[in-house]
């Protein structure tokens, strides 16, 4: 959530930045009008309360002097009613302001490319050249079904479209991948491994910015305020909800494997086959808590942590700086890692690493006490390290052989019981 005082004092700059994120000018003008009305009403209320206090003292004096205070008492009843009415008006404006401020996205950092969508994303760097095949590479779902390691048909029978069974060496490959990812993050990158709740309340979903704006994107438990997590970012970030940390403990690194549940509202007709877009998938998440001074340094480190996984797996990828119109709601800056998918002859997102600055911390009240004993909002960061199913897809396509087998990436061989080929 944005700082209302900052919005008021820097309105033109805030308006210009939010418009690059698709926010309509009339919404921001309405915010300013409501904010001014609220401040005017607060001044009136304070003046009335001061007048009431002064007259109350006069009434007390009149009573001590055994003089008639009836008129002033009647006047104070009227003033009290006026104060109550103004308070109600202020509360109504507060609700309107909250309806606006809770749905405004974060301000983009000055380094973020300005643009309406993914077409304006900027490539930062690439790693490795895509493999040249001596045969036409098959899509991963075809490779997997021929090997009998993924079953989309029975997944659909049991749960509907966009669900899958991992089977045999397919399940082993998925498990090998997330164990490899967690080991790298914990033992080499310095993250603390967590196992989180997979169901969270509305407060947690609000804290990370999914609610109230994106309720249609998740699976909610009927007749409760509980939701299946769309990402482990939600329980990991909210671990410190409404807490004050010791600044000396920052930065704090968390990582967790969890299923992610997405309704994929608005994705009809997109990626209807394969592992790219499912309602349920495993993901290893990275979350950081930082001070303001070092959060962008931590973003670069987090992005490098995700890149190292792809490099060790030998998967070609590129890093994209997302434009203002393509970033997620809570992000101030985002890098996407896109892995090469041979059958589609294109790069597809496999990780997204974001600095949310103090946007989530304001919503979740995550603070720290600095060296001067002043309480500050923390900066929060999150990133995929990596989406496991999409990594399986990338391996099946990039490491497929002409005979239909799949070579196991060298770094995964120990995790696969020294198996070198899936066939």
Curated annotation (Swiss-Prot):
Belongs to the class-II aminoacyl-tRNA synthetase family. Type-1 seryl-tRNA synthetase subfamily. Keywords: Aminoacyl-tRNA synthetase, ATP-binding, Cytoplasm, Ligase, Nucleotide-binding, Protein biosynthesis. The gene is serS2. PROSITE patterns: AA_TRNA_LIGASE_II. InterPro entries: aa-tRNA-synt_IIb, aa-tRNA-synth_II, aa-tRNA-synth_II/BPL/LPL, Ser-tRNA-ligase_type_1, Ser-tRNA-synth_1_N, SerRS_1_N_sf, SerRS_core, tRNA-bd_arm. Catalyzes the attachment of serine to tRNA(Ser). Is also able to aminoacylate tRNA(Sec) with serine, to form the misacylated tRNA L-seryl-tRNA(Sec), which will be further converted into selenocysteinyl-tRNA(Sec). Homodimer. The tRNA molecule binds across the dimer. One of its GO terms (biological process) is seryl-tRNA aminoacylation. The lineage of its organism: Bacteria, Bacillati, Bacillota, Bacilli, Lactobacillales. Its EC number is 6.1.1.11. This is Serine--tRNA ligase 2. The keyword Ligase applies. One of its GO terms (cellular component) is cytoplasm. It is found in: Cytoplasm. Its main location: cytoplasm. L-serine binds at residues 231-233, 285, 384. Pathway: Aminoacyl-tRNA biosynthesis; selenocysteinyl-tRNA(Sec) biosynthesis; L-seryl-tRNA(Sec) from L-serine and tRNA(Sec): step 1/1. It catalyses: tRNA(Ser) + L-serine + ATP = L-seryl-tRNA(Ser) + AMP + diphosphate + H(+); tRNA(Sec) + L-serine + ATP = L-seryl-tRNA(Sec) + AMP + diphosphate + H(+). CDD domains: SerRS_core. Pfam families: Seryl_tRNA_N (PF02403), tRNA-synt_2b (PF00587). Consists of two distinct domains, a catalytic core and a N-terminal extension that is involved in tRNA binding. One of its GO terms (molecular function) is serine-tRNA ligase activity. ATP binds at residues 262-264, 349-352.
